[in-house]
């Protein structure tokens, strides 16, 4: 889901406070309450995971990449790159996609340590990603037992923002049954953005951040 700013309203303010208090009570460790604090203004974290497959119940994270965004800038000096040691070997198909072999991952972090590092890197900043739902499902499967809750930060889904952008450009008669290509290559090419040939988590996070910034510019940073 994408987040959009709303004008301040007493009921909305009360509901947000109520939700925060409810989540605070569910936290497994009070030291992690920073995830529910106020986010730094005009900052986000773009993230991506590489995994052994697409089954959120059975597959495993092998790398995590994240980068901070501030206003219209990607803070490449503030990025996170983590290799994760999976409990089982990686298949040949998996290696062909993310180029991470078993020996590359042998010195990786245990997944619990990796997601806790990610949690501290994110803080309370809203999240950005391309098909973020999958990445968060993989992360939350590990994090929920440690944190007591799923990642509570607002989400900005790049494919949804792009869909909204393209939908607004369609004439009314085509808005009834729109056909909008949401493939990442198409999205990046249409937005006039460069694509990295490297397929790894941090590069994918940077490209999602580029698309997010461009789409905000096209929307007038509403």
Protein language model features and the residues they cover:
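Conserved non-catalytic scaffold segment of RNase H-like nuclease domains
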Residues: 14-17, 21-140, 144-152, 178-199
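The feature marks non-catalytic terminal segments
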Residues: 216-222
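Long, acidic (Asp/Glu-rich), low-complexity accessory segments flanking structured domains
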Residues: 1-9
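Short alpha-helix plus adjacent loop in nuclease-associated cores
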Residues: 156-176
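Short, glycine/acidic-enriched loop or turn micro-motifs at the edges of active sites
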Residues: 49-53, 160, 207
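Conserved protein kinase catalytic core
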Residues: 54-56, 163, 210
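Acidic, divalent-metal-coordinating active-site segment for phosphoryl/phosphodiester hydrolysis
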Residues: 203-211
């Amino acid at each position: 889901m994408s987040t959009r700013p709303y004008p301040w309203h007493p009921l909305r303010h009360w509901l947000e406070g109520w939700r925060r208090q409810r989540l605070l009570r569910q936290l497994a460790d009070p030291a992690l309450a920073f995830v529910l604090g106020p986010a730094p203004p005009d900052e986000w974290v773009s993230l991506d995971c590489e995994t052994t497959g697409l089954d959120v119940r059975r597959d495993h994270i092998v790398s995590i990449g994240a980068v901070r965004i501030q206003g219209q800038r990607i803070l490449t000096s503030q990025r996170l790159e983590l290799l994760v040691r999976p409990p089982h070997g990686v298949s040949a198909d998996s290696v062909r996609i993310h180029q991470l072999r078993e020996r590359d991952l042998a010195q990786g972090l245990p997944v619990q340590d990796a997601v806790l590092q990610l949690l501290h890197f994110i803080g309370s900043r809203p999240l950005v990603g391309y098909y973020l739902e999958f990445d968060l499902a993989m992360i939350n499967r590990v994090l929920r037992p440690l944190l007591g809750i799923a990642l509570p930060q607002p989400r900005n889904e790049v494919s949804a923002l792009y869909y909204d952008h393209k939908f607004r450009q369609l004439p009314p008669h085509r808005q009834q049954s729109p056909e909008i290509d949401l493939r990442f290559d198409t999205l990046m090419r249409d937005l006039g953005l460069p694509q990295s040939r490297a397929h790894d988590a941090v590069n994918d996070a940077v490209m999602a951040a580029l698309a997010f910034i461009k789409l905000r510019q096209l929307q007038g940073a509403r």
